[in-house]
C-alpha cells in the first residue's frame, strides 16, 4: 500500500511542476515585456490566485460530482495552473521587469531585435531559475494539499498516503488505539517527499543567488 500510494504523488508532482513552470515562464516573460497593459490585468489576477487555498479548492470540487475525476493527474493540472498563474507568475514578472532595463536588452533593441525574440531568447533563459525554484516550492504545497484532501476522501479512491493515514486512525480505534505501524510510513513518506522538493528549491536559489 505504501509503494502503491507513492505513484499518485509522483504523477501529481510531475504534472504540477511542468504545467506550472510552462505557464509561468511563457506568460511571465512575454506579457510583462510585450503586452504591458495586459500585464496590469494579469497582475491583479495573480494576486487574487495567491489568496486561493488549494486544499479548499480540492475540498469544494470533491463535494460535488467531481470526486471520481479528481485523479492525481487532474489535481496536478489544477495545482499547476493555480501556481503558474499565481505566485510563480509574479516572481518571474518582477525578474523580467528588472532584467528588461539592463544594457544587453537595450543593445538588442538597437540592433533591431523583435520583442518576442528578445523575450524568448534573451530574457527567458535568465528567469528560468526563478520559475524552477518557486515551482519546486509550490509542488511541496501541492503534495501536502493532496494529502489533506485525500484524508477526507475528496479526491477519489486512488490508493494514496492520505487514505492510509485515515485508515490508521479510523480503523485503529476499533482495536483500542491508533495503528502506528500504518500511520508512521505514510507520514514519513509525505515528510520526505515534500522535503525533497523544498530542499531542491533552496539549492536552486542558493546556486543562482535568487533572493526574491
Model-derived features with residue positions:
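C-terminal transmembrane helix and the adjacent membrane-cytosol boundary/short C-terminal tail
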Residues: 64-70, 79-83, 136, 175-212
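Generic hydrophobic transmembrane alpha-helix motif, especially the helices
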Residues: 38-89, 94-98, 132
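Transmembrane alpha-helices
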Residues: 10-11, 15-19, 23, 116-149
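Transmembrane alpha-helix signature in integral membrane proteins
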Residues: 1-33, 193
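Glycine-rich helix-loop "coupling/hinge" segments at transmembrane-helix boundaries
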Residues: 145-184, 189
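Short cytoplasmic-facing helical segments at TM-TM junctions of multi-pass membrane proteins
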Residues: 91-123, 127
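Non-cytoplasmic
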Residues: 59, 76, 84, 131-164
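Membrane-spanning helices that line or support transport/gating and their immediate boundary helices
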Residues: 25-29, 33, 37-44, 91, ...
Amino acid at each position: 500500500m505504501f509503494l502503491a500510494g507513492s505513484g499518485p504523488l509522483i504523477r501529481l508532482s510531475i504534472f504540477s511542476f511542468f504545467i506550472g513552470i510552462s505557464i509561468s515562464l511563457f506568460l511571465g516573460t512575454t506579457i510583462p515585456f510585450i503586452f504591458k497593459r495586459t500585464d496590469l490585468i494579469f497582475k491583479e489576477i495573480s494576486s487574487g490566485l495567491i489568496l486561493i487555498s488549494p486544499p479548499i479548492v480540492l475540498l469544494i470540487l470533491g463535494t460535488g460530482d467531481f470526486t471520481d475525476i479528481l485523479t492525481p493527474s487532474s489535481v496536478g493540472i489544477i495545482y499547476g495552473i493555480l501556481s503558474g498563474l499565481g505566485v510563480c507568475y509574479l516572481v518571474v514578472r518582477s525578474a523580467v521587469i528588472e532584467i528588461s532595463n539592463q544594457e544587453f536588452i537595450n543593445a538588442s533593441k538597437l540592433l533591431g531585435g523583435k520583442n518576442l525574440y528578445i523575450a524568448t531568447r534573451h530574457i527567458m533563459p535568465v528567469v528560468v531559475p526563478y520559475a524552477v525554484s518557486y515551482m519546486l516550492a509550490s509542488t511541496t504545497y501541492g503534495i501536502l494539499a493532496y494529502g489533506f484532501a485525500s484524508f477526507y476522501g475528496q479526491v477519489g479512491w486512488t490508493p494514496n498516503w492520505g487514505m492510509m493515514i485515515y485508515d490508521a486512525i479510523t480503523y485503529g480505534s476499533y482495536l483500542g488505539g491508533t495503528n502506528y505501524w500504518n500511520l508512521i510510513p505514510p507520514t514519513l513518506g509525505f515528510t520526505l517527499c515534500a522535503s525533497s522538493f523544498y530542499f531542491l528549491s533552496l539549492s536552486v536559489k542558493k546556486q543562482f543567488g535568487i533572493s526574491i
